[in-house]
């Protein structure tokens, strides 16, 4: 790797930033109180995250801490030439992934109505970065507008073949990433 650097240096004063992941509203408040960075869950709809961003910023202010430099979100990402193609290629793997999440109860910490046992079209709405390059750019910009500025993007999932995942990643690198700089 040329010109690579770690995103977190091991020795920092007073310490490396403490990232605290949180799904529910209560844990988001706890992340504001105890951590340096809120790591927003990869499961919630954008509307839930927008509500939680307000909760987080309010709790940070209430505890007298300055607003954090970074606020982190993780999302499943799939880019194809068209939204229809992205849905067709990603759907089987995402449906299976969220079916497993539901059996593990991972949606039980989310607000009522934000659940995983929905038809795929409803599940995918505002939950994934999914579509054409232009679709994905617009979706990422929506996360930026509500305050997320550090993205962890999950491109490859069980049940998604390597070649399909790699082509999506290449398309992201060629057409989406340059537009976000």
Show which residues each predicted segment covers.
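Active-site-adjacent structural elements that line small-molecule/cofactor binding pockets in enzymes
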Residues: 1-181
């Amino acid at each position: 790797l040329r010109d690579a650097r770690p995103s977190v240096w091991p020795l920092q004063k007073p310490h490396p930033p403490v990232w605290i992941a949180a799904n529910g509203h209560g844990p988001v408040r706890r992340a504001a109180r105890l951590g340096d960075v809120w790591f927003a869950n990869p499961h919630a709809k954008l509307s839930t995250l927008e509500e939680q961003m307000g909760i987080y910023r309010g709790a940070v202010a209430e505890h007298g801490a300055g607003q954090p430099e970074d606020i982190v979100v993780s999302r499943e990402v799939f880019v194809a030439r068209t939204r229809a193609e992205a849905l067709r290629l990603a759907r089987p793997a995402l449906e299976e992934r969220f079916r497993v999440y539901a059996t593990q109860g991972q949606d039980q910490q989310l607000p009522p109505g934000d659940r995983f046992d929905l038809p795929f079209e409803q599940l995918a709405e505002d939950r994934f970065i999914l579509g054409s390059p232009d679709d994905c750019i617009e979706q990422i910009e929506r996360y930026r507008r509500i305050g997320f500025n550090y993205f962890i993007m999950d491109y490859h999932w069980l049940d998604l073949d390597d070649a399909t995942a790699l082509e999506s990643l290449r398309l992201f690198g060629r057409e989406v990433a340059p537009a976000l700089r």
